[in-house]
Amino acid sequence: MPVWEIVLRYALLLAVLALMIGPFLWQLSTSLKGPHENIFSSPPSFLPSSPTFHNYERVADTIPVWDYAFNSLKVAAANVVTNCVGATLAGYALARLRYRGRRAATIVFVLAMLVPVEGIIIAQFTTMRELGLNNTLIGVLLPACVSAFNVLLMRNAFLNLPYEIEEAAFVDGANVWQRFLRIALPAVKGTLAVVAIFAFMGAWDDFLWPLIVLSDPDRFTLTIGLNYLHGTFANDERLVAAGTVIAVLPLIVLFACLQRYFFRGVGEGAVKG
């Protein structure tokens, strides 16, 4: 490979990295700046002259951030469990079980991915109201408890497994649950980690649906609570930046713990042509 192609490739990678990581680093820098530092100076100053954690203390004084974070954690953890269980069972059924309408069911899941959430959000709200789940964390969880994308991801992971292994287990007398739990499921742990990460991120970052379904401040999730850091007539960008960093840190920790499974799982669940 010519040298100029290598240089161009790494230059593009660095440019993409700057676009992806730059805004977060800027928010982190802003959150560490004191009230006497001008965050809108020209040229901009990236490194704070006197780093301080006072902005994080102010976030906790302004809103009950830890209560909101705990509500988000409950919803996100439940979303991980329901997606891992539901998507795994549905994905295995679509990939391995033989029944009439299996292809049609797969098409339904694909079509479900194409429907924008905003287009069905009124129907979701009406359904939650009829079930008496408005203003509850269960009402926040239920619409996204099993994602069509995660189902298809698990389906493709199971399709990539050699079917001969399960056939041999079937000949030895293993039933479908034994083949699923002892052969198929251990082989797709990487994809399961990907599903867990996507489910946690989706629930943790969700703003629109909790904003619509929740009205009691004691049940607010973190994304809604952080919205109250914006003033009506004036904003303290340092305070908002500190709240943003608090919201992002759990996602960074989760990905750091599961990254080796994530990259392996992306390959397991890749869409086959």
Language-model-derived ranges and their functions:
Residues 5-273:
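A structural signal for multi-pass alpha-helical bundles of membrane permease subunits
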Residues 1-3:
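Short, Lys/Arg-rich, polar N-terminal cytosolic tail immediately upstream
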